[in-house]
């Protein structure tokens, strides 16, 4: 079934979302900060949250800046592990368990204080946070509509189908897909990049909300048609 098209970003998206990806490094943080900035420009008190950072803290700093420092950096990112690995692995290396209670308390407080909250997961949908707790479980606890960021490249179809299937298996709503282009302006996209959208629309009953061009620094404020890039 083809995805239903909508005319504006607000009609497509709740202003509070859980953002996941088909993998690590697909552009979740870039998309998250674009959404936070977009909603704030529309007058919403929107802030970003990345509950867990592993390695550097640059992702949290970008969300903090997008939120115009409306909340402390430690609320944007309550748990920071230095090893650049999956949270479960990083916690073992640091010999300190991840403080899930702190994440839950911070999320609950931000959700109550701000009408718009963009939560960015860490890595992909099934990345382990603890031995028996995954990103998917964190999303389920947050209870927000889930949007999947997809790097538009070879392999995207399989990764997207598996991710959407798992989201639904966890009883959550997949609110849509955002295609993030990896080919820079002036480069010739390959056949996968030029066909992934139409194939995903044919195979999934999930809307492709919009596409992000490589290096794009804003989501248009004008009405956004799903038929082309944002």
Go through the PLM ranges and name each one:
Residues 103, 107-130:
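Switch II (G3) loop of P-loop NTPases
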Residues 25, 34-35, 54, 122-211:
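Conserved catalytic-core segment of NTP-binding enzymes
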Residues 16, 30-97, 101, 106-109:
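N-terminal phosphate/diphosphate-binding loop that engages ATP/GTP or pyrophosphate donors
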Residues 19-20:
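Hydrophobic anchor at the beta1->P-loop junction of P-loop NTPases
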Residues 4-13:
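Arg/Gly-rich low-complexity intrinsically disordered repeat tracts
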Residues 81-82, 209, 214-220:
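A short acidic, often aromatic-flanked loop/helix-cap motif at beta-alpha or helix-coil junctions
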